[in-house]
């Protein structure tokens, strides 16, 4: 049975990747269908109730700069906001928000339901329709076929998902949801490498049974940050505290005593877990010399008693979970509302993807999110936006687009995945980016919004606000460069008390701002130098561009050198055995990875600069040198 309409783009799955993919394709004018097994869980925060953090917050800002929904929803759902690394340089500062699960889900669903060109339909997908290596549609659980030349799969942990609590296990996509078994079996028939990964979640605790007086209170920042470039503090709901406690030796003894019934340590779980978000069992095993581990006590919302104890993700049996929770200070009488568990699921080797996130094997089939081996809402949302956008571009007959590594963390993420692959759940850190001084949270819109507008992702309201901000920054920079003060002027007499070394020569306002002891707000408060910019985002941009101009210029020069051959394209049909001079190891690796560009090839382990030179000579001789989009 065929559905009565055709669609330009079909998105399968309604998590963080799926919602951003569907919204992106629809914003670009494509007739889009979002298929989900349950409309009520669209935008669900399946694990921790938080958005952002180091590296992750950068991705959220990039999603926002390209017109995505995650940052906006966070501003409406965030019940605590903090700027991490606030005492460090701007490159590594990151915004993190504790979110009310219900408010976040409601806001995402509201955005989806009001998006033109987007249809939502509740049905699980069991099959793909593929003809001559081209996807042409999907088939749902009830046998209903939907036709489309572009399909984005955002299946999360649902592909052959198996939930483990102790030595007991059962099939599930996440707690309370069925797995996608038929679709997983269908995907295993495709010529794409498949593996198993695992992730986990902690038990949820009843707040009424916690003694918060024994814990350290952690308040949010003041003044309050916002997540979206279009956000405002007035969008935030009521702000509340989180709390901090610690495990202890008794906790660790309880965990060690239960390891014989741990699915991880008894060989029941085959999948590899996230290195940077390990289970409490893993922490005790890997860091045996540590006598305690920090636990963040995070409220799940304003109208629920559920608490998320961040730091004790576990798949131990329930009796062990209860004992370990009650061994922790402040939780001696705690009651568990939901047990912690681990979940194993299928993922597909992202080296089998183009950097558009389209599969190399099947035209029109795109993957985004945990299906590609990543972990985290932010990583999923960023991939979803890129996949939905490129699916729409393909339907429109336009070239795919992906930012370079020096343009966005999204570019770093996709390049790492498609070039290097991953054997464990991949999460983003600022340390993964070579050019992080240019890839700051604060300038994500300056880096990406113009491109987003060109692609059709950015609406008129965002574009107008961005254009106004850019103009105000440029005018203020011109003012600071163009206004000068003499050492004997009244302005200097007012300024000198604020300086470590008095001004002894004529100086521009820009030079004064560049001094280490001076910042923009302080300078603007001194009579004769203000009033300055009212928009805090624009003011921050002015300060960073002035103070870091030398470093930024040097990093830009490094990038210009590096990208000379970065985008030189490599034919996917090229058999590297035909390239004379390459070693057998290099031939095997290049034929295995099938990199799209010289830049990707150069980042494959074992590919030497000499091999790259040989490749370039071969391409030139054969007339195959071309620049990738």
Curated annotation (Swiss-Prot):
Binding site for FAD: 13-18
Family: Belongs to the MnmG family.
Name of the protein in question: tRNA uridine 5-carboxymethylaminomethyl modification enzyme MnmG
HAMAP family: MnmG_GidA
Subcellular location: Cytoplasm
InterPro entries tied to this protein: FAD/NAD-bd_sf, GIDA_C_N, MnmG, MnmG-rel, MnmG-rel_CS, MnmG_C, MnmG_C_subdom, MnmG_C_subdom_sf
Molecular function terms, GO-annotated: flavin adenine dinucleotide binding
SUPFAM superfamilies documented for this protein: FAD/NAD(P)-binding domain
One protein family per Pfam: GIDA_C_1st
Cofactor list: FAD
Record GO cellular component, one term: cytosol
Classification via NCBIfam families: mnmG_gidA
């Amino acid at each position: 049975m065929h559905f009565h309409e055709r669609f330009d783009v079909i998105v399968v799955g309604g998590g963080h990747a799926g919602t951003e993919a569907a919204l992106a394709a629809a914003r670009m004018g494509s007739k889009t269908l979002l298929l989900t097994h349950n409309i009520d869980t669209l935008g669900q925060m399946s694990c921790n109730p938080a958005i952002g953090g180091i590296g992750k917050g950068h991705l959220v800002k990039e999603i926002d700069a390209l017109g995505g929904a995650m940052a906006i929803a966070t501003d409406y759902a965030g019940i605590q906001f903090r700027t991490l690394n606030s005492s460090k340089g701007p490159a590594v500062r990151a915004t993190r928000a504790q979110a009310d699960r219900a408010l976040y889900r409601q806001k995402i669903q509201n955005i989806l339901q009001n998006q033109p060109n987007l249809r939502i339909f509740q049905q699980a997908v069991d099959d793909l329709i593929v003809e001559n290596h081209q996807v042409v549609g999907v088939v749902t659980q009830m046998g209903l076929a939907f036709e489309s030349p572009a399909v984005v799969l955002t299946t999360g942990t649902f592909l052959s998902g198996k939930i483990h609590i102790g030595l007991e296990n059962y099939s599930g996509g996440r707690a309370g949801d069925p797995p996608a078994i038929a679709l997983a079996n269908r995907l295993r028939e495709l010529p794409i490498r498949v593996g198993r990964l695992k992730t986990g979640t902690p038990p949820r605790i009843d707040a009424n049974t916690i003694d918060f007086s024994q814990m350290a209170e952690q308040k949010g920042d003041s003044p309050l940050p916002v997540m979206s470039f279009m956000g405002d503090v007035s969008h935030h709901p009521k702000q509340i505290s989180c709390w901090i406690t610690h495990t202890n030796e008794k906790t660790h003894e309880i965990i060690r005593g239960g390891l014989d019934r741990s699915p991880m340590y008894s060989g029941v779980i085959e999948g590899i877990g996230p290195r940077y978000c390990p289970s409490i069992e893993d922490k005790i095993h890997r860091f045996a010399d540590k006598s305690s581990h920090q636990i963040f006590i995070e409220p799940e919302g304003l109208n629920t008693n559920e608490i998320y104890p961040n730091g004790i993700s576990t798949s131990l049996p329930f009796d062990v979970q209860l004992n370990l929770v009650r061994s922790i200070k402040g939780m001696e009488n705690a009651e568990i509302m939901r047990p912690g568990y681990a979940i194993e699921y299928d993922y597909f080797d992202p080296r089998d993807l183009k950097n558009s996130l389209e599969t190399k094997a099947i035209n029109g089939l795109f993957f985004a999110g945990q299906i590609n081996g990543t972990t985290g809402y932010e990583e999923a949302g960023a991939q979803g936006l890129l996949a939905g956008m490129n699916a729409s571009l393909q339907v429109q007959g336009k070239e795919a687009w992906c930012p370079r590594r020096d343009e966005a963390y999204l570019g770093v993420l996709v390049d790492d995945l498609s070039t290097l692959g991953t054997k464990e759940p991949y999460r983003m850190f600022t340390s993964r980016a070579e050019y992080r001084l240019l890839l700051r949270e604060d300038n994500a819109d300056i880096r990406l919004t113009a491109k987003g507008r060109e692609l059709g992702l950015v609406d008129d309201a965002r574009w107008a606000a961005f254009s106004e901000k850019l103009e105000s920054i440029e005018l203020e920079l011109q003012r600071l460069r163009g206004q000068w003060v003499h050492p004997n002027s009244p302005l200097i007499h007012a300024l000198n008390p604020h300086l470590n070394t008095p001004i002894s020569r004529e100086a521009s306002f820009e030079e004064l701002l560049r001094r280490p002891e001076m910042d923009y707000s302080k300078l603007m408060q001194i009579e004769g130098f203000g009033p300055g910019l009212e928009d805090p985002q624009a003011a921050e941009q002015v300060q960073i561009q002035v103070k870091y101009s030398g470093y930024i210029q040097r990093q830009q020069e490094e990038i210009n050198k590096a990208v000379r051959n970065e985008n030189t394209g490599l034919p996917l049909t090229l058999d590297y055995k035909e390239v004379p001079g390459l070693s057998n190891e290099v031939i095997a690796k290049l034929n295995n990875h099938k990199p799209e560009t010289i830049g990707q090839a150069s980042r494959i382990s074992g590919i030497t600069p000499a091999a790259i030179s040989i490749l370039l000579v071969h391409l030139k001789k054969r007339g195959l040198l071309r620049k990738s989009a």
